[in-house]
Amino acid sequence: MATGLTVVVPAWNEERRLAVTVGEVVAAARRHLGEFEVIVVDDGSTDGTPAVARKLAAKFPCVSVVRHETNLGVGAAFHTGLTRARFPYLSLVPGDNAFHESGLDAVFALVGKVEMVVTYRANPRARTPMRRLLSVCCTRAMRLVTGRPIRDAHSLYVFPVAQARQVRRNTGYGYHIETLSTLLRGGVPFAEVPVQLNPRPDSSSKVMRLGVLARLMATMGRQFLRFVVLREKVRFAPVAAATLTRTRRRPFALTRSQREVA
């Protein structure tokens, strides 16, 4: 089984934390992976993030930088990385250093040993009660939609690129709900591992904004309609490994309708 991994690191105004995040990603990847790349997606930052990203690309040959001219959101950053990925597996690691480096070790160690990795946060009390309640609700809804007993629906993942590219493009914050639920319904085998959160103020997390919460619920509701009410079947077309390299530099652009969804 192939083991190459593309790591997407979205960053919006993360000049203080991006270097630490990328440094830990590269260190963990070197410990566990034979081949990997890191794609930093500067999502329209207005602070010193672009300069930090350029320095990281100069320091680490495995790091490349893609810039969105305006802030499009984490879902758009995910799809930018997915479109450009050169390897058969992909993980998104937030540029705000939300996860402890030990979690990266646990995740990267499983790349190529199972088709998909789903993590669960072992120290959820590092977040506020409201954030924990949101996570519990999201996880229970994901179990209902997919019929799979996962422990956490909102953490780190490793997705198989060939299958993830066949999932409906969701450029909003609910990209992970769309992708994870579709892959689980499609029968992609997975393993679960615990990860640790780094303490931080929840006020810095965009997931707690009302507009974001509404879009998350809308995405989950649409998946419930598809898979529970309409009993839609998921079938993935076989994709040759060579396809990954042929599409690795295709430009990413959002249509007006996609911007409205995001």
Where on the chain are the PLM-derived regions?
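Hydrophobic helical membrane-anchoring modules
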Residues: 1-5, 145-147, 170-262
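Short loop->beta transition adjacent to catalytic acidic/histidine clusters or analogous donor-positioning motifs
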Residues: 3-5, 26-40, 48, 61-64
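Conserved sequence signature across two-component system core domains
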Residues: 11, 41-43, 68
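Acidic helix N-cap motif at the loop->helix transition within catalytic regions
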Residues: 16-20, 47-56
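Conserved donor nucleotide-binding strand/loop of the catalytic core
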Residues: 36-39, 50-84
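A conserved acidic beta->alpha catalytic loop
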Residues: 42-51, 97
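Acceptor/aglycone-binding surface of glycosyltransferases and processive sugar-polymer synthases
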Residues: 68-84, 89-92, 98-173, 200-211, ...
